[in-house]
Amino acid sequence: MLFACAYSLHGQTTYTDGVFILNEDWYGHNNSTLNFIRPDHPTDPFEYYIIQNNESNAGQSLGATAQFGAVYGDYLFIISKQDQDAGDGLSPGESAETRQGGRIVVTDAQTMEIKSRIPIIRANEKGVSIADGRSFVGVDETKGYVGTSNGIYILSFSPFEITGRIEGTENPLITGDEDNADGVGPLYQNQIGMMLRTADYVFAIQQDKGVLVIDPQTDKIIHTVEGCFSTMTQSKDGNIWVGRNTNMDYQHYPYGNMGSSGECWEGKELLRIDPETFETEAVPMTEGGINQTWYAWTAGSLCASTQENALYFTYNENRWSWFTTSKLYKFDIDTRTFTQIYDSATDKRYFYGAGIRIHPLDDQIYGALYLDNVVQSYWIYQMDNQGQVLKELEPIDRYWFPALFIFPDNYAPEVEELPDVTLEDGAVEIDLGSKATDKDNLDAAIVKTVKSNSNEDVVEARIRNHRLTLQPKAVGEADLVIRFNSNGKYVDRTLHVKSLTTGIRHTEESPVRVWGKDGRIHIKGLQRPTHVLVYDTDGRQIRNTVLSPGDCIEGLPGGKCYILKFNRKQYKLIY
């Protein structure tokens, strides 16, 4: 059985045996809330208000209109649009001044004890907030990124504090003095949406700009997949998927002429992005579609199974309403087949907010449904991966407005021991992708890094696309510590390397030639795996890679000038 009884940690209830449901809750009356569901509990599957009711969190709560949360490592990160709902006063005599929230709230992932609360992410010179919360992604053991209405911010974990904003992600329209009451102002433009961490990069949607590719080592944008997109996920095979607006006449918010309704958005295409080359493939949606999520931003329903190569999403064909979404679809990636697997309209119930998520352990779908905005009746559906309803759970009556399901992360990655390596004649490449797996996360998203090298004079070690390249530099031995980080939980393995060669070939090297053809940059004359840096004409680094003889660079836009640097030389190319 997947769900068992809760247990205590030093006298505290722990939340590892069920599913979190993050609620916007009743805007204008109180801050957002977090409930916990144990579907197999014999009498009461719901535990309510687990943040506010935690004795360790006296006087603290989530912010107003929370839309996103994620477990990363030992912490749960919850992002709200505002820090405080002016109507929050849950007890007689209690006011908003006595229960403080935050746009960023960090809790212990097991006990829900608040560890940090950040009310303002960025302020203008008057102290007015100019960055409302949107999303979060864990980057490594030291930091995460926070998506907002005004850029992507770097969140340090020790201590929990904002240390900067990623250049090129800002919203130049926001000053703190604008009026957004009409629903089409600066707050609703240039927003950051969903973000994902892959093995080598961070992908983030910026409204109407495209998918930004960020180097997590430098915190800089290295590539942009241009376009008008909504919501994003990563599939079991490692590819990135976004919903694409196919109405080329309305590529900018509000996607129509009728205020903020977005009636001209046509999300009839998925775009697949290769996580390493950034090559794209447009996949027409023969059934269903992807609704835009920018007005009253939500995380969107598009999500991926960790058990099979499939995506799930809900879709509302009525472009004039966000509140009557009833159809649930499955996309089989391998067969490129779209199938409607459920329709809740027969019960006059509708998916709310992000609507659905897939449990990583048993592949069951969790759906949040309601009647409409003025009725306090809600249901949590537990479904199999073919859309068959297994269980209906009904919480107490309240204006919950559920935003997102969040699953505990109970397992660290399982990593094989690494056998010793002897370098006899040149570089050796080792596939690390097959060395690690994680029961409750995507294997394709496990980040591999070289944490230490006991003798850098003997061997140079680099990891890219799950592959470790060992380049001998001198005769000798070295111990490498390779870290496998899966969603903030990590395992280290030691690799012993013995080099019997200097790695220097004494034959005359062929002349190097660089040229572009068929959307690829080719380099002829490489004698060994070579570290290649690619810059644009403004001096921005846009690619950092290791090429073996015969490899080429893909995914760079044509018609531009590039500068390549390798082997202490510089090459200029236009293709």
Regions found by a protein language model. Name each.
Residues 476-488, 495:
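A short beta-strand micro-motif common to beta-rich folds, especially ectodomain repeats
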Residues 293-373:
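Loop/turn-rich, solvent-exposed surfaces of beta-rich toroidal or solenoidal domains
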Residues 505-575:
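C-terminal outer-membrane/trafficking sorting elements
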Residues 467-477:
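Extracellular/luminal low-complexity segments enriched in Ser/Thr/Pro
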Residues 488-501, 571-573:
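C-terminal edge beta-strand
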Residues 409-424, 440-445, 496-520, 526, ...:
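Residue-level detector of functionally pivotal "anchor" positions at catalytic/ligand-binding pockets or at interdomain
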Residues 368-412:
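Blade-level signature of beta-propeller repeat domains, shared across WD40, Kelch, NHL, RCC1
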Residues 59-68, 123-141, 172-197, 226-237, ...:
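Repeated scaffold domains used in trafficking and secretory/extracellular systems
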